[in-house]
Amino acid sequence: MTNTTGRVPLWLVGTVAGTLVIGLLGVFFYGAYSGLGSSL
C-alpha cells in the first residue's frame, strides 16, 4: 500500500460495493422468501 492519500484504492471501492450489493440482494431475497415481498 503506497501513498494512497487523496485517492481511494480501486480494490477497496470494489470490495465495499460488492459487499453492499450482495447484502442488499440477500436481504431482498430473504424478505421475498419469508413472504415479506412488500419490502420494495
From Swiss-Prot:
Lipid bilayer topology: Single-pass membrane protein
Keywords: Chloroplast, Membrane, Photosynthesis, Photosystem II, Plastid, Reaction center, Thylakoid, Transmembrane, Transmembrane helix
Domain of life of the source: Eukaryota
Residue runs in coiled coils: none
One GO biological process term: photosynthesis
Positions of transmembrane segments: 10-30
Localization per record: Plastid, Chloroplast thylakoid membrane
Keyword Membrane: yes
One cellular component term from this protein's GO annotations in UniProt: photosystem II reaction center
Homology family: Belongs to the PsbJ family.
Its job: One of the components of the core complex of photosystem II (PSII). PSII is a light-driven water:plastoquinone oxidoreductase that uses light energy to abstract electrons from H(2)O, generating O(2) and a proton gradient subsequently used for ATP formation. It consists of a core antenna complex that captures photons, and an electron transfer chain that converts photonic excitation into a charge separation.
Subunit structure: PSII is composed of 1 copy each of membrane proteins PsbA, PsbB, PsbC, PsbD, PsbE, PsbF, PsbH, PsbI, PsbJ, PsbK, PsbL, PsbM, PsbT, PsbX, PsbY, PsbZ, Psb30/Ycf12, at least 3 peripheral proteins of the oxygen-evolving complex and a large number of cofactors. It forms dimeric complexes.
HAMAP family per the UniProt record, alphabetical: PSII_PsbJ (MF_01305)
Protein name: Photosystem II reaction center protein J
Organism from which the protein derives: Adiantum capillus-veneris (Maidenhair fern)
